[in-house]
């Protein structure tokens, strides 16, 4: 809408005037965004989404400020303009599109690799959605994976809300949950899960 375009124009003017662009991320989703423990401060945030943020800042002639937050807080931060943008493995959804501008790449990408991550040695036990009946599934609130769990799995699935994928993987590998709703891309970092 015309009103949205004015908001974006004002944001661009603000970025150019201050020389700073503020980006929200939830740095717990390697390889997109995560923390390099050998680095400090803003340099400790690394990954593909961080590099994209740096590129955008460079093209705008601005300094990139990274603000970390729980994934479920990102949409509100963008909607309230407390940050200029979010690059945090945000898959497209109609709800998100109503409250923020989304790039075409996110709309075309990331939503196809969603699923339930399970221990690799139990993968053969889970071949249909019904196989998760009565199971405990960890999921981040506000994600498309949450929508997957609540709409496509049996109603008796026990949902365990988590604040980060790292928490979910820890719960899965220690047997506290039967699965974690997540991305197959994320699973590539953990050979013990499928």
Regions found by a protein language model. Name each.
Residues 33-40, 53-62, 107, 145-162, ...:
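Ligand-binding cleft/hinge of the Venus flytrap
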Residues 73, 90-99, 148-152, 166, ...:
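A ligand-binding cleft/hinge motif common to bilobed small-molecule-binding domains
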Residues 65-77, 124, 159-174:
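Short helix-initiation/N-cap motifs at beta->coil->alpha
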Residues 79, 100-117, 165:
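Short Pro/Gly-enriched coil loops immediately N-terminal to beta-strands
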Residues 106, 118-137:
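Flexible hinge/capping segments at coil-to-helix
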Residues 22, 61-63, 79-89, 135-136, ...:
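Alpha-to-beta junction loops
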Residues 21-25, 129-143:
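Short loop->beta-strand "edge-of-pocket" segments that line small-molecule binding or catalytic clefts
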Residues 3-90:
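Extracytoplasmic small-molecule ligand-binding "clamshell" domains
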